[in-house]
């Protein structure tokens, strides 16, 4: 679905890239936040017990939730990171700790 807002009730960020590409990039970015699991109120022990496929599944769910939530809430804390939607720049920024920053292009 190109060039529109996705989500049943108009939520989600405006984008021009394929949703799957954005979701893949956002999944990778949030996966770099070491305690991203805290977003789902998971304990470190539960996260440590997950195999890589399980962790990927959690990060994909997180990326999808963030994509829709950022349409109404442009700054969201995720563990020790922060995810920021900048509509004028057509990007989602992921701040990891105090210094590392990555971004996901939306167009």
Predicted regions and their residues:
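Alpha-helical propensity feature that highlights long, continuous alpha-helices across diverse contexts
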Residues: 2-107
């Amino acid at each position: 679905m190109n060039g529109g807002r996705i989500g049943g009730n108009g939520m989600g960020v405006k984008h021009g890239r394929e949703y799957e590409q954005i979701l893949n990039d956002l999944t990778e970015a949030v996966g770099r936040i070491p305690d991203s699991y805290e977003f789902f109120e998971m304990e470190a022990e539960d996260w440590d017990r997950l195999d890589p496929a399980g962790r990927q599944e959690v990060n994909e769910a997180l990326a999808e939730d963030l994509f829709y939530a950022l349409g109404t809430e442009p700054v969201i804390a995720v563990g020790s990171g922060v995810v920021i939607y900048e509509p004028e720049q057509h990007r989602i920024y992921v701040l990891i700790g105090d210094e590392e920053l990555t971004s996901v292009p939306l167009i």
